[in-house]
């Protein structure tokens, strides 16, 4: 069984909410911070409480490495400890690293994020340099069932600068990327009909949602853009297949939910936000 199979089963069991642990120190409630601890140690305490509170309603977690790299060595220890906490909770974890290099460098990235202190179940990758920026990760998919989510059509406003440019044959650049990755993924199929090579498909540009889902039925989607970035449940639902086939990420909306729920502890508020998000997406899927 591949990690993508396990993610599919996690979504079946708990829903498609992906909790983004893009944890900035400034997000921590002031009365939670222990002055005798480092920023990294406080972030780990915060993350662990969030994981404990939300693991029953989270399909997976996504840990954005930049928030930890910015704190230097203590931040990287916090990153490793956070990945470990998610894995110990028995929930799939995505390392949001967006690597895009080739050859030996990419081999080292793959080793660094699929084994050892920073081991994760999935990584995010950037395909701009070509398929040889993806291939060094594939032995881990083949031998260990590891997975990856490759940037295809993203949720940021600047996506239109490159991804939406049209080719001579009428396709967009994101179509070319998706087509090549979908074809490559045919050799890495899991038991539930999804490849170990997933796609990052932003939930804020919905014009082609139905077409994209129908076109890449073998590809599991990582769908950013929900909540703070403007993505709505009724839009997100169009990228899912009977409520599965993708995970929907929310970071600030969950991490900072306590600011919209006065008097509620941050971990309880995060749980409430996950439940609300899960129910909203399920309702939207039921209307399709």
Tell where the protein language model's regions lie, with residue ranges:
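Conserved N-terminal beta1-alpha1 strand-loop-helix module at the mouth
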Residues: 1-63, 68-81, 85-92, 262, ...
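Conserved anion-binding
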Residues: 97, 101-198
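A C-terminal functional module that forms or caps the active site or interfaces directly
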Residues: 199, 203-249, 253-257
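Surface-exposed amphipathic alpha-helices with a cationic face
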Residues: 8-12, 83-87, 138-142, 182-186, ...
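Conserved, mostly hydrophobic/aromatic
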Residues: 19, 61, 96, 123, ...
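Active-site beta-loop-alpha junctions enriched in small/polar residues
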Residues: 22-26, 66-68, 98-102, 128, ...
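Glycine-enriched alpha-helix->loop->beta-strand junction motifs that scaffold or abut catalytic
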Residues: 13, 58, 115-121, 142-148, ...
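Active-site-adjacent beta->alpha loops and helix N-cap segments on the catalytic face
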Residues: 70-85, 102-107, 129-142, 204-213, ...
């Amino acid at each position: 069984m591949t990690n993508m199979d396990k993610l599919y089963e996690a979504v079946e069991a708990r829903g498609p909410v992906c909790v983004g642990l893009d944890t900035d120190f400034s997000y921590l409630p002031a009365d939670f911070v222990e002055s005798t601890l480092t920023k990294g140690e406080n972030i780990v305490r915060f993350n662990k409480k969030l994981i404990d509170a939300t693991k029953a309603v989270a399909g997976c977690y996504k840990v954005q490495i930049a928030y930890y790299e910015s704190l230097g060595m203590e931040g990287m220890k916090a990153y490793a400890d956070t990945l470990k906490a998610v894995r110990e909770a028995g929930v799939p974890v995505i390392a949001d690293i967006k690597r895009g290099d080739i050859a030996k460098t990419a081999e080292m990235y793959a080793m660094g994020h699929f084994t050892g202190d920073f081991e994760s179940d999935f990584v995010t990758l950037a395909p701009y340099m070509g398929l040889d920026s993806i291939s060094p990760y594939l032995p881990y998919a083949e031998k260990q069932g590891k997975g990856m989510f490759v940037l295809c059509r993203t949720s940021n406003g600047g996506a239109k600068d490159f991804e939406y440019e049209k080719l001579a044959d009428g396709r967009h650049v994101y179509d070319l990327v998706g087509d090549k990755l979908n074809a490559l993924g045919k050799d890495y199929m899991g038991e539930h009909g999804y490849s170990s090579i997933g796609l990052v498909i932003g939930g804020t540009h919905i014009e082609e949602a139905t077409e994209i889902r129908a076109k890449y039925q073998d590809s599991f989607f990582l769908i950013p853009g929900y909540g703070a970035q403007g993505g709505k449940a009724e839009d997100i639902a169009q990228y899912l297949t009977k409520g599965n086939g993708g995970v929907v990420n929310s970071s600030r909306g969950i991490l900072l939910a306590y600011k919209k729920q006065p008097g509620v502890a941050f971990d309880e508020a995060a749980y409430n936000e996950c439940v609300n998000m899960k129910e909203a997406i399920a309702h939207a899927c039921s209307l399709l």
